[in-house]
A protein has these predicted regions:
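C-terminal interaction-tip segments
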Residues: 1-20, 26, 116-133
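Surface-exposed ligand/attachment interfaces on beta-rich extracellular proteins
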Residues: 17-22, 37-56, 118
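Solvent-exposed, conformationally flexible loop/turn segments
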Residues: 28-47, 87-90, 94-97
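Short beta-strand/loop motifs in extracellular/secreted proteins, especially
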Residues: 60, 71-73, 120-124
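Short, surface-exposed beta-strand/strand-loop-strand elements in extracellular ectodomains
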Residues: 65-87
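Noncatalytic modules at the cell exterior or secretory-pathway interfaces
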Residues: 103-123
Length: 133
């Protein structure tokens, strides 16, 4: 049974325009994952988070947010051979074109490898909506 995921973006620029975008996407399944990523400053080590069991192209909406952001919070997609990226703010992607920024056929968005050297534990929340496996 399909589930409707609605979202709304409000963009307000001081002394400039305000833009509101709303949309919805139908997904077959969704997961909400919350993980505590321990600080590994003394010996940087990634925490592996299973995001979804599907192949490339199954994700329709993705939200990644944290209680702390910065250059010392980094992630990789799929495995440790992919590019390391900095989690310096929340990530919200919807649609194949946007999600292609993070995944490709050789590196599906099935896992996130998160390395935390911020000096304290960090809580990361991931919401993923996808088509059936």
């Amino acid at each position: 049974m399909a589930t409707n995921v609605s979202w709304k973006l409000n963009l307000a620029i001081q002394s400039g325009p305000s833009v509101t975008i709303t949309n919805a996407v139908q997904v077959d399944a969704f997961d909400r994952i919350e993980v505590t990523v321990p600080d590994t400053t003394n010996s940087p080590t990634a925490t592996t988070v299973d995001v979804q069991p599907s192949a490339v192209g199954k994700i329709k909406v993705l939200l990644i947010r944290s209680n702390k952001y910065g250059d010392q919070l980094k992630y990789r997609i799929h495995d440790n051979t992919t590019d390391e990226r900095v989690l310096n703010d929340a990530i919200f992607l919807t649609g194949a074109g946007s999600l292609d920024l993070l995944e490709d056929p050789t590196a599906p968005l099935d896992k996130l490898l998160i390395t935390n050297t911020t000096g304290q534990d960090v809580i990361v929340e991931i919401i993923v909506g996808r088509t059936a496996v």
